[in-house]
Amino acid sequence: MYLQARQGCIMRELSSRSVRPRRRKTLQIATLLLASAILRLHRATAAERVDTVPRIAIVSAYEPEWLALKSATSVTRTEVIADVTYIVGSLEGKDVVLFLSGVSEVNAAMTVQGAIDHFKITHVIFSGIAGGTNPGLSAGDVVVADRWSEYLESVFARKTEAGWSVPKWLGKTLGNYGMIFPYAVEIAHPGQSKPEKRFWFDVDPIMLETARSVADKVKLAACLKQDICGGARPRVVVGGAGVSGPAFVDNAEFRRWIYDTFKANSVDNESAPIAHVAYSNHIPFIAFRGLSDLAGSDAGENTENELERLASDNAATMARAFLRDLPARESSEDSSGKTTR
């Protein structure tokens, strides 16, 4: 408001015949600078919709994960907002917007919220790779978790002679890994004095049922590196838990703790925070994760780079089959512009 008022004062002064030419030139430059500042302020503060068509957000973390999806998309246009490139178009008969979140939790949460603010998002889908934690699964398998946790939201406990000492407010936990004691995230809601505590974010049941209905029909690519993958044919596994955190897990002992404690089939960096954002915005969410390895199990170097294309493409294959069968969702908007069920 101050900038706009100041611009008005300058314009009134410019209209005065008593202003000298040099002074007038200075005021003209000042007006242009103020107009530019007002425009930038408007763009920075207003999360304006750039598209009114209801769309499914399809998210991947980094370039290899979305190659197969991007090449299959019929692109209408691209939008660049806050340095994020959004590809607008259609895929498998559905209106979509594709984008890369960037790797890890903050990037994922930030970019997905940005998409929700600027597009009319009806569903959020993640397609990408993950490390396996279930020893019964193999590289190339696609896991579709029914719930997600930010498992490294935690207390690092104090070590005493009697053992680990944790704050009284922590309460009961699922199980610790040394000094690491996981606990629920807190979610603020308008009109509530206390935040909601939530450890698991459930996948939308309709989306999960759709995934189950197509899982057995999907033909995944086989792993050609038998020395790494073994002889198992890749398959889709629907159900079970998944966890996400800021750490790249390449430690077999820690991976075993993840599986024993959370019964998680996979570990990654983005799915749970995206599930968190989707939950807060009342938007259905699901993730398709192709396994690039059993975390920490490689005899030599980590095999993620060797198998990321297989894992990415298999996740994309499942995501496309899912999109074809996903029923349309009626959506409305509340007064804030957020999509609601």
Please describe what each predicted stretch is:
Residues 29-34:
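Sec-dependent N-terminal signal peptides
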Residues 57-63, 69:
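Mature N-terminal segment immediately following signal peptide/propeptide cleavage
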Residues 1-22:
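N-terminal secretory signal peptides that target proteins for export/translocation
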Residues 10, 65-66, 105, 267:
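Alpha-helix N-cap/loop-to-helix initiation residues
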Residues 36-44:
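C-terminal segment of classical bacterial N-terminal signal peptides
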Residues 48-56, 80-341:
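Glycine-rich phosphate- or other oxyanion-binding loops that anchor nucleotides, phosphorylated ligands
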Residues 22-28, 42:
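N-terminal export leaders
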Residues 72-76:
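Short Gly/aromatic-enriched secondary-structure transition segments
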